[in-house]
């Protein structure tokens, strides 16, 4: 089982997200933790119209531990001092990016359109060296990192994490899938 994090708004009953309303302190910022099947499975299997990508972060085990501590500290900070979500300045992308800036020597320009507009965040991470391998193009990385089609094929089962990573199933696991 893998741990997953989603930075999002805390919606109240009957409340719907609006990017315009997100500019005006309408929503509280929320860190949601869960199993990959809960957080990623919803976006891949339950919303088949969404394209979902999973990128491996270029980090040492020590950096991963530091990243986890940073996320835990930030979560505790939000419990003590809640903040509002802001469509441009305190959103799902830059909430996570704040934790990854220590993985790259580059100075982060928080007003870069690739940071302000989440649809370009993967390119920013690639250009910063946070994701991708030497000699790999962004287009190639994006193609091999797309997971929604694999996830939709198998559904949200016990093998979900292996499937979205493209790992081969063992003979026993394959037999379970065929049954």
Describe the predicted segments one by one:
Residues 1-52:
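Glycine-rich catalytic cores of cysteine/serine-nucleophile enzymes that process amide/ester linkages
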Residues 32-102:
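Soluble catalytic domains of enzymes that build or remodel membrane lipids, polysaccharides, and related
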């Amino acid at each position: 089982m893998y741990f997953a994090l989603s930075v999002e708004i805390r919606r109240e009953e009957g409340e719907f997200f609006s990017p315009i309303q997100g500019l005006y302190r309408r929503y509280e910022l929320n860190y949601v933790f869960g199993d990959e099947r809960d957080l990623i499975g919803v976006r891949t299997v339950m919303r088949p119209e969404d394209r979902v990508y999973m990128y491996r972060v270029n980090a040492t085990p020590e950096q991963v531990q530091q990243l986890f501590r940073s996320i835990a500290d930030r979560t505790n900070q939000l419990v003590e001092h809640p903040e509002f979500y802001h469509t441009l300045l305190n959103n799902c992308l830059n909430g996570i990016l704040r934790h990854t800036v220590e993985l790259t020597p580059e100075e982060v320009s928080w007003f870069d359109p690739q940071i302000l507009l989440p649809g370009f965040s993967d390119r920013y991470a690639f250009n910063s060296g946070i994701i991708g391998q030497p000699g790999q193009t962004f287009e190639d990385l994006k193609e091999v990192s797309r997971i929604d089609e694999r996830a939709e094929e198998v559904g949200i089962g016990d093998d979900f994490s292996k499937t979205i990573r493209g790992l081969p199933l063992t003979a026993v696991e394959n037999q379970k899938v065929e049954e």
